[in-house]
């Protein structure tokens, strides 16, 4: 069994939980996912099955799209709605929407983030959330991410001393939308957190086409495996090249191939089928992953 699944992960489960349940449903252990989603987040979780597990790193490289809500007025330990309140800055007067949009625009392009303490990033061999649960705070490594698009998608609404609005973000892998929400609040002079989030697109797959675990289980019971999409979907933004019969034979035997390209990696096709991921070595390409 090989292929890629567009899974709709529902709230209340980790990405690992989803993989564990799919292994039982599909009766195979060779399953991985293409990008972690926090337990409270609903949305597209790309799943790789069989040979497709070798495509996970390329699936993760593609940009992701999120829709969510930011609340100004208080921040939390986890930077989302599930954490305990750590700071409050009441919103006592209406915000200037133009200034809000300017602050949002200032957070587009390449930016630096510090991962939240409640995250799976490892420091000295331990995950940050393990330190956080033990009441310890450690120095967290900065990371460079890219925000391709960040826009407000609703008017600002007010409730008591809080302000809320929805947003849409297209970003690179490794981006923490929780942290982006907190950073925006800081630019506006308010404690803030991400109060809701949905991932609407990842690895070229859209939420409107995604299936829940329950829907997949129903199809498997009917021996309908049409939800398994081809490996070719997982190449992400890699440039496609058509290989000759002779080059395919070289790939089969692990030999270098002469190709003219400035790309560091290429997706080698034979007809409509992906046969290899090629890696540049000086003026030639070496088969890095082979699917023959």
UniProtKB/Swiss-Prot annotation:
Keyword field: Isomerase, tRNA processing
GO molecular function: RNA binding; tRNA pseudouridine(55) synthase activity
GO biological process, any: tRNA pseudouridine synthesis
Record has Metal-binding as a keyword: no
InterPro entries, per the entry: PsdUridine_synth_cat_dom_sf, PsdUridine_synth_N, tRNA_psdUridine_synth_TruB, TruB_C
Highest taxon, organism lineage: Bacteria
EC identifiers of the protein: 5.4.99.25
Catalytic activities: uridine(55) in tRNA = pseudouridine(55) in tRNA
Catalytic-site annotation from UniProt: 38
UniProt keyword tRNA processing present: yes
Role played: Responsible for synthesis of pseudouridine from uracil-55 in the psi GC loop of transfer RNAs.
UniProt cross-references to HAMAP family, sorted A to Z: TruB_bact
Family the UniProt entry places it in: Belongs to the pseudouridine synthase TruB family. Type 1 subfamily.
Listed name of the protein: tRNA pseudouridine synthase B
Organism: Streptococcus gordonii (strain Challis / ATCC 35105 / BCRC 15272 / CH1 / DL1 / V288)
